[in-house]
Amino acid sequence: MFKSTLPIAAAISVALTSMVLPAKALAANEAKTNQFWWPDQLSLSPLRQHGAESNPYGEQFNYAKEFASLDLAMLKKDIQTTLTDSKSWWPADWGHYGPLMIRMAWHSAGVYRVHDGRGGASGGQQRFAPLNSWPDNVNLDKARRLLWPVKQKYGRKISWADLMVLSGNVALESMGFKTFGFAGGRTDDWEPDLVYWGPETAMLSDKRRDKKGKLKGPLAAVEMGLIYVNPEGPHGKPDPLLAANDIRMSFGRMAMNDEEIVALLAGGHTLGKAHGAKKPNGCVGAEPAAADIEAQGLGWKNKCGTGVGADTISSGLEGAWTVTPTQWSSNYLDNLMNFNWVLTKSPAGAKQWIPDNKAAANLVPDAHIPNKRHAPIMFTTDIALKEDPQFRKIVERFRADPTQFDLAFAKAWFKLTHRDMGPRARYVGAEVPSEVLMWQDPIPAINYQLITDKDIKQLKKQITNSGLTTSELVRTAWAAASSHRVTDMRGGANGARINLEPQNSWAVNNPKELGKVLAKLEGIQARFNKKSAKTKVSLADVIVLGGATAIENAAAKAGNRITVPFSPGRADASQAQTNVKSFNYLKPKADGFRNFYTDDSYSSPAEMLVDKANSLGLNVPEMTVLIGGMRALDANYDASSYGVLTNNPGVLTNDFFVNLLDMKTVWSKDKSNAGIYIGHDRASGTEKWQATPVDLIFGSSSELRAIAEVYASDDADKKFINDFTKAWVKVMQLDRFDLK
């Protein structure tokens, strides 16, 4: 388908640095990327990140196994000891680092977004720029340094990604809250993730909305450098109702509903305080990424007063929300609803709210100075919970039943910190909760014997004789498996959700053809299962086996006998186990492997292909060989001939590469069909092929052409088939966490 007053947050950002690369940083001897000279050139960098060679523990390192061997109780005890061991270089508020650790964990997980699954706690990306230097993460570098002795003690058995989240849990528990549970298993990354965080070139700026004020693309935060929303209100305007709109939009794009939003904001602001002791100008130094080398990775050095403790400057807002900032309670809800709140400014100049009742002026103990007390405060985003009618109903319900509030926060916190981990099969540790939650995309446990090699041969024969074509079987298997995203480990063939709403209605899956194919595969499944009381096969397995069978037959037609590796063990989910709205976020706007592209795609067809390959965890050669194989197998989503550069569609050959690189063909734009190119015989002018930008990029991009040449060579036949098969199986097994 080719068709007014500067907000305090902004002031702090300017005071710290604009985060725009200074000219002097472009050293004379610094290599410039090709994109520097040719901005429109396709970047393949996303497919080259996080290689096994970047992991100092080595390619064979099994973190889940290491974590499983950990003494979790002892680790939690060590974290708890750290929470109350106040250090002079960063004194703890009220002698307790708990609120700081909660903020660290929250901001680590809170960059997750549902539209592309990127962000989240996995990988421990908060250690790296840009996240470690975002204005909203100011002074969280200290939280990680406080935890370093714990990380140092346990080494490879606890990742930073897990440690940050676990420390947030321990902090909550140490302050009297009962958490829902904790799952380990988040591996660490060793380099910054290449993520599109927005179009802006300066921190705390906003150029990411459409004319209606909605966020564009996959973005979730409302400004560059924020985790969610501006606490002072949209663009610093202290309007609670406008803030409510931003909150609902931003948190919604991070997979949270209204109840979860209220629970998280109220629960998070029950503990701790904001820091804005002084105006940042002239006080606060550069963020970690811009700090001098002797700072050793720490940033935001404050030269005013002691620079720490009572003189701390973080967000610029100042104060605590409750009278017990280190003890869990429902006081936040009471304060929010009981007081009439009036607008004021913090010592740093940030817009915030205090009670109009002077009797409230001494309710909150100072975090560092004995016998000094303050009024509680609220952000504009807090007042939004009171002013927005829907949020207010939830606040009143929680206030009337604090136990309901506690459970709602516990579950919302667990979801926040585990959303990007994928299904429960990836959870590790003694504190994994037993309750199965809908957002975990549950799949039933297998309670039957799996099919044997003999059964597989029998099923392959039935599939071959079913009347289904190679293209139909390949398209169906790909549609099922390629819904997986390695970004948040959602989707995939397991569960056979390709047979359920919403996936069976997606245009990219060609619903009419899909229904026909699945009906025949279900018939094969039913006949097999009827024969045996103990041995069963799932539809999910039959779908993947159908793709394998088709590829074997297509290779045989080219004179190559191969066996596509197949591992049974997938199960079938039900419609009741499938949240339609949630799964619709997996709906592809483009899938270059099937030559599918929509007008509301975030970027060009070639860029969307790279994005899709990245979400499948593919490298450049894997992406390349899969494109060649899918075109040879005639697997375009709509059965079109675009890019099917072969006279033998449905036969697994390297014809796509051979014909694409053939100098006897000259390409030109199709004047009557935007986005389509026509390949003519250079000598006669006869039309030979039609193709899309996704097809032609493998001859146009010098990097992709280099790989295409490998597969177009006369000696590439076996290599092409072997590499295609290996890459195909990789995609089919992306969600088979039981095999890893």
From Swiss-Prot:
It holds the Pfam family peroxidase. GO terms for cellular component: cytosol. Residues 1-27 form the signal peptide. Formation of the three residue Trp-Tyr-Met cross-link is important for the catalase, but not the peroxidase activity of the enzyme. There is a cross-link at residues 228-254 (Tryptophyl-tyrosyl-methioninium (Tyr-Met) (with W-106)). InterPro entries: Catalase_peroxidase, Haem_peroxidase, Haem_peroxidase_sf, Peroxidases_AS. GO terms for molecular function: catalase activity; heme binding; metal ion binding. It catalyses: H2O2 + AH2 = A + 2 H2O; 2 H2O2 = O2 + 2 H2O. It comes from the Bacteria. Belongs to the peroxidase family. Peroxidase/catalase subfamily. Bifunctional enzyme with both catalase and broad-spectrum peroxidase activity. This is Catalase-peroxidase. It comes from Colwellia psychrerythraea (strain 34H / ATCC BAA-681). The lineage of its organism: Bacteria, Pseudomonadati, Pseudomonadota, Gammaproteobacteria, Alteromonadales. The gene is katG.
